[in-house]
Amino acid sequence: DRTCYPVASCNLQDFHNLVDVYLDAVFHPRCVDNEKTFQQEGWHYELDSADQEMTYKGVVYNEMKGVYSSPDSVLAREAQQALFPDNTYGVDSGGDPTVIPKLSFEEFKDFHGKFYHPSNSRMWFYGDDDVEERLKILDSFLCEFDKKEIDSTIGTQKYFTEPKRVVASYVAGEGEEADKSFVQ
């Protein structure tokens, strides 16, 4: 339901530079303007040699493969999906590596354009630096956007009428016995 970008520095010039970098990265990311960047960061096909199978690669894709290989993460995700099957809390924000390759560049751009807009944001500053300077920095980014009505309402999960049992599987670690690997 949110993405947080905390920025801090004891050096005021560094802080202002970081705010510029973060605002630019959030509201003007290269991956929504350049399909090659989307492919590098998200996912793409890769062929190391002609005699091997084509594989999926990408920064996010590889990170999520790592997340999905941890028994703790697998079981926590299964619990979240079982508890919240009807709203966003049951969905993994990083993406399921088996589904990530189905995301098109256009779908990604549309999602970013809808939800990563200043009209759908909250910004806080804390500190004893000049408030006017902060507002000038924000204005330099926000002035180019028009206000949009964005429905980012998250529906309430319906109550369960009976107990729910979830059985999930995951890959046991190397050297572990599958039947004794993990219980939670």
Across the structure, where does each feature detected by a protein language model lie?
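Charge-rich, well-structured scaffold segments of protease-associated domains
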Residues: 1-183
